[in-house]
C-alpha cells in the first residue's frame, strides 16, 4: 500500500500540474472502487479550478472553491500525469482532464477511493475518514513525549500501534518495520512498555526513515509509481529489514526474521532489536 512518502511524492508531482488550473472534465471509466464514485461528481467538478493540492496522512485532498475531493490510492494505486490524449491502459479508472495534461488513476485492485466533501458538510478535517487521524510525523509537536503519551495505555504491540494511525499518521507496514529496526525496538514489544527515552528514539527514527523515503521518491515493490511514472527507490537503497527474511542483518549479520502481526508481515533483527 502506498504510505506517506509515496502519497507525498505524488502530491508534490501533481501540485504544479493542477493547482490553479481548471478541470475541464472528470472521466470515470470504473466507478466501483472501495466506495462507489458518486455519479454526479463529474458534473460537480467540470469547469472548476483546483485551488490547492494537499495531503492528510495517506489521503490526497484536491481543494475546489465549493468543496474537497478526497483521493486514496488503496493497496496498489498510483496517480500520474500523462500527456493529453494518451490512450488508457487496463486498470486506468479515472482521468482528471485539464487543457495541458491529464491526471490518471491506475488501480488494479480497486481498493482506492475518489470521494467528494462539499463545503456545506463542514470542514474537511471533520470528514469521517480524517477526523480521527493522528499527528503528522513532520509536525514539530511529534516527539518522544507525544508518542509516549499515546502509547502508555496501549497493550498492543508497538508495530500495530504505529500502524493504527491515531498516534501518528502515514506510517505503514514498510516504514514501521524499518523505523523500529533503526530505533532498536522489537516490534512485538507492548506499546505501553516503551520508555519515554525509547519513544524519543523511535519518533526520531520515524521521521528519519520517512525523510529518506521522500528523498528516494518512495518505495516501489509492485505497482506504485510517482506522478511522472518513475518508480521509487527507497527499498533498493535503504531497506534494512523489510522483505529480507533469512538474509543477514546489515548491522550484525544475524538472519532477519519474519512474523505476522495483525495479518501483516513484520521483519526484524532478533539481535539488534530488544524488547
UniProtKB/Swiss-Prot annotation:
Its EC number is 3.2.2.23, 4.2.99.18. GO terms for biological process: base-excision repair. Keywords: DNA damage, DNA repair, DNA-binding, Glycosidase, Hydrolase, Lyase, Metal-binding, Multifunctional enzyme, Zinc, Zinc-finger. One of its GO terms (molecular function) is zinc ion binding. The active site is at residues 2-3, 58, 264. Its cofactor is Zn(2+). DNA binds at residues 91, 109, 154. Binds 1 zinc ion per subunit. It catalyses: Hydrolysis of DNA containing ring-opened 7-methylguanine residues, releasing 2,6-diamino-4-hydroxy-5-(N-methyl)formamidopyrimidine; 2'-deoxyribonucleotide-(2'-deoxyribose 5'-phosphate)-2'-deoxyribonucleotide-DNA = a 3'-end 2'-deoxyribonucleotide-(2,3-dehydro-2,3-deoxyribose 5'-phosphate)-DNA + a 5'-end 5'-phospho-2'-deoxyribonucleoside-DNA + H(+). Monomer. Involved in base excision repair of DNA damaged by oxidation or by mutagenic agents. Acts as a DNA glycosylase that recognizes and removes damaged bases. Has a preference for oxidized purines, such as 7,8-dihydro-8-oxoguanine (8-oxoG). Has AP (apurinic/apyrimidinic) lyase activity and introduces nicks in the DNA strand. Cleaves the DNA backbone by beta-delta elimination to generate a single-strand break at the site of the removed base with both 3'- and 5'-phosphates. This is Formamidopyrimidine-DNA glycosylase. It comes from Bordetella petrii (strain ATCC BAA-461 / DSM 12804 / CCUG 43448). The lineage of its organism: Bacteria, Pseudomonadati, Pseudomonadota, Betaproteobacteria, Burkholderiales.
